[in-house]
Amino acid sequence: TNQFTQKTMEALQAAQRLAIEYSNQALEQEHMLVALTQQQDGLIPQLLTKMNVDPGTFEAAAAEKVSQLPHVTGSGRDPDKVYISNELDQALTAAEKQAQQMKDEYISVEHVFMGMLQRPGRVAGELFKQFGITPEKFMQVLSAVRGNQRVTTDNPESTYDALKKYGQDLVEAARANKLDPVIGRDSEIRNVIRILSRKRKN
């Protein structure tokens, strides 16, 4: 695998915009942590919450670290060019290994976060320590959310919670007596059955 999921690409782009906005020459782990935590419907805020870490507080702390990075301005610098720092590069390499280990076909946001946990730069390391985030804790909450599903598409987040959400929505709808008759929805139902049987096979 060397393909990133949509959310990983979005986070990399957001991190790059952040670095440009702050006139930072290098894309650091801190930028990436802010970008990953900012993904509203993303997996990382959800996993942080499950580790009893408030995503907003974590994001603010990471953003504070970004604001302390050296600003590079002046004629010699192309404002739109940002290179990946050594530390982030190592974390992305670790993320790729993590994806392979987990037999995933794409590098997803959880692999990137895990990569930073395994190869933290000094500043990211301080953040993880401050919030009590460890690789073990992270893997624990990740497997609770992901179950034994593998990342086989570039948009895996849509499936992780789909079943839980779908089940929940049906229960709530039944309570509120809002369930539609099932006529004409066979394609939808087939879809759910396919997802369920795939889950069993895994």
Spell out what each predicted region is:
Residues 1-202:
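Histone-fold recognition with a strong bias for associated Lys/Arg-rich disordered tails
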